[in-house]
Design a protein with these regions (language model features):
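A structural signal for multi-pass alpha-helical bundles of membrane permease subunits
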Residues: 1-283
Length: 283
């Protein structure tokens, strides 16, 4: 709630900022800036505030798409890792390798693969500008993020699968339930608490995404893959620590709202009640 330091045109010295109220929040939310004449007007092009809502859209787009893909792929990987086999331990170790690799290394790896002369364009037979075309760059980041964090989802879902008693599946087999019926009426309801925890963790992590798009594509605030976290870092680099703190508060409120909605309406308690109902329906 404090103004940032600014240069006094009369003395040429930096002066301390005073109480700003909600000025910083209005700066980000409404793109309103103080003009040279002291009036408040629309921020000109190039000001960070003009990139706020585009970065919010990009962040939410990344979150929805990556979490959805990682959930579907994570369930499949967890089912494979939970299936009894001689190489189950080897499969589990191999699946977790992408998650164990540092994000910076992952970003550079995929950056090389998506280069104009990289392996991706060679396999596709087309010269796609993955790092400059807006939508191609976004999908490149999504692919890299899904490859990196799907094992995390699979690990949490696997923990839920291992909590399901084996005799439940035996009873379903005796009753003549098909594989699809077993999955939809037993596996999915009983694993839902762990699944919702995995989705919650990944959603919160995706909302604060920063290093992957910065290293792969660009750290600029007007990049097609710029997230909200990038604006915070860029604002701090310009010395605007108070407005950057206000933006960090807005990010916190966004993450808190998403977490509250997911816990309140899609929490483990709801999943547990639905799971018990599903178990009664299979008997």
């Amino acid at each position: 709630f404090q103004s940032d330091k600014h240069l006094d045109p009369a003395t040429g010295l930096f002066t301390e900022g005073g109480f700003a109220g909600v000025e910083h929040y209005l700066y980000w939310l409404t793109n309103r800036c103080m003009t040279a004449s002291g009036e408040v007007g629309a921020c000109p092009a190039g000001v960070l505030a003009t990139d706020f809502w585009p970065s919010v859209s990009v962040t939410l787009f990344f979150t929805v798409v990556t979490v959805a893909l990682e959930t579907v792929l994570g369930i499949g990987m967890a089912l494979v890792m939970n299936h009894p086999s001689r190489v189950r331990s080897l499969i589990r170790a191999a699946v977790l390798i992408p998650w164990a690799i540092p994000t910076a290394v992952t970003a550079k790896l995929w950056q090389f693969m998506f280069a104009p002369s990289g392996i991706v364009n060679s396999l596709l037979g087309h010269n796609i500008a993955w790092t400059t075309d807006p939508w191609a760059a976004r999908f490149a980041v999504i692919i890299a993020d899904v490859w990196k964090t799907t094992p995390f989802m699979a690990l949490l879902i696997l923990a839920g699968l291992q909590m399901i008693p084996r005799d439940v599946y035996e009873a379903a087999r005796v009753d003549g339930a098909s594989s699809l019926q077993t999955f939809t009426r037993i596996t999915l309801p009983l694993v839902r608490p762990a699944l919702m925890v995995a989705i919650l963790f990944r959603t919160l992590d995706a909302l604060r995404m920063y290093d992957l798009p910065v290293i792969m594509i660009s750290g600029s605030s007007n990049s097609p893959t710029a997230t909200i976290s990038q604006l915070v870092v860029e604002d701090m680099r310009q010395g605007n620590f108070n407005s950057a703190s206000a933006l960090s508060t807005l990010i916190f409120l966004l993450i808190f709202t998403v977490a509250f909605v997911m816990i309140r309406f899609l929490g483990a308690d709801v999943g547990g009640r639905q799971a018990s109902k599903s178990m009664k329906g299979t008997r």
